[in-house]
A protein has these predicted regions:
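Charged, non-catalytic accessory extensions
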Residues: 177, 260-290
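Second RecA-like catalytic domain
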Residues: 1-257
């Protein structure tokens, strides 16, 4: 069976099984492999943005907005039927075909894991709350920082750092901007870019804030980052890139040769040891292809 997702996302799914948050990782891998199912009708942009923000349940994460929306659609579909689920999708400006594609892809990946004897085949009647896979492999599915950490590994090296009220830096772009469709844009519109007026922190937060992003594209206003989530420094250091430099006298660790992390004296070696422990369960070290 051929994997329906790219290798990096396939390895992320294996990490989801290892760290026992399989269901959300299967869904997020499927979401990343398809176009967004959130609709943005020109005559209802404000409502579309409000829906997406509400779906995030207070988290600064477009990825969690999509994850929560899909899981609610799935729950309604299983409990009340397809018509009720589709009504939920229509009323919340979601594309039913996109949701169905995510369902199909996530089930295909689960079947692949079962076929490879990596997870047990659990009938739907024994699954908890309609989650995919063995309940034992989902005991951490509600641990949001863990889920975002594993997502960071699947999206690597898509990491950005806030450098000014509007601008961010990525590994290849000295200046980038959060796309207005993201819940982390802070109300920034494309016309605001390049404005001479002073801004509050319209981006993700103050300088130093880290984000992971799904895609980026070049528009007339610059480089825009789409589907973003704020992550913590340790998540960025351990999962969102490769540690390129070892501890030096300044106690600075650098990710992907561009993003430095400075630690108090004696802390950096402990972080390196922790990273090595995580690397020991990295699916990249396994002896089969994904």
């Amino acid at each position: 069976m051929v994997s329906p997702v790219p290798p990096a996302l396939g390895k992320m799914v294996l990490l989801g099984a290892i760290f026992k948050c399989l269901d959300p990782i299967l869904i997020l891998a499927s979401i990343e492999s398809t176009r967004t199912f959130f609709l943005k009708p020109p005559n209802a942009l404000e409502r579309a943005n409000e829906i997406r923000t509400n779906m995030a349940l207070g988290l600064p994460s477009d990825h969690y907005a999509a994850l929560n929306a899909y899981r609610e659609w799935r729950f309604i579909k299983q409990e009340q039927g397809r018509n009720a689920a589709n009504e939920y999708a229509f009323s919340n400006l979601m594309h039913v075909g996109g949701l169905a594609m995510i369902e199909k892809t996530s089930l295909q990946m689960l079947e692949m894991l079962v076929e490879w004897d990596l997870v047990r085949d659990i009938p739907p009647s024994l699954r908890y709350n309609h989650e995919l896979g063995d309940p034992e492999l989902n005991v951490n599915s509600d641990v949001q920082p863990l889920v975002l950490a594993l997502l960071s590994s699947g999206l690597a090296p898509n990491l950005a750092v806030q450098t000014s009220p509007i601008l961010l830096q990525t590994g290849s772009d000295p200046k980038a901007i959060i796309h207005p469709s993201s819940i982390n844009s802070g109300g920034l519109s494309i016309k605001d870019v390049g404005s001479s007026k002073k801004h509050r922190y319209l981006g993700a937060g103050p300088p130093g804030t880290l984000l992971l992003f799904s895609t980026k594209n070049s528009m007339s206003g610059g480089i825009f980052l789409r589907e973003t989530s704020i992550i913590g420094p340790l998540t960025g250091l351990m999962f969102a890139g490769k540690l390129k430099s070892v501890v030096d006298r300044s106690n600075v660790l650098t990710v992907d040769d561009w993003l430095p992390f400075k630690f108090e004296m004696g802390v950096a070696p402990q972080v390196c040891q922790l990273i090595r422990c995580v690397d020991n369960v990295n699916p990249s070290n396994l002896c089969f292809d994904i």
